[in-house]
Amino acid sequence: EAQESERRQAEFAERTQLFMDTMNVDEMVAQLLVAEGFTNLEEVAYVDLDELTSIDGFDQSTAEELQARARESLEEINAKAIEHAKELGVEQSLFDFEGLTPQMIEALAEDGIKTLEDFATCADWELAGGYTTVDGKRVKDTGLLEKFDMSLEEAQTLVMNARLQLGWVKESDLAKEEEAAEAGDEDEEQA
């Protein structure tokens, strides 16, 4: 219980610092955002204004300014990520692929994934993270996109969409696999 409390306090402090650094707000404003459940710039930048104005002390003008700062900061971060990814040799096919942010593309490029073809060869757990057993012990594998809160399901969908886009699989193949999986589930239920 003490460890959990320490973890939450560290997370709170980390998020507070993130907002202070990226949005140029004072500690009190940053703490209010974190206390209200905001965890990243995207949430502040694109949340409905009513959610911000419902916070004690935040009027319409303050909420609009916070969103403007968050969006401006995101644009700067995205531009730097794109520039770095290009320096690393990322091909346009990966930039054009829907579902990956510039920061995700940068993280992939840092690991040598620079084309849509490279991305399509990834396993879901390589992106989202997971656990494997090594010498009888359960070991955590950190996913390349885990820091972006990527779930296994999201990773599966993105990889499958890349494979579809490249023509490696067809929609009809996926439909057949789904039907077979559903039939297998029904067989298990009847047993």
At which residue positions do the language-model features occur?
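C-terminal extensions
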Residues: E1-A191
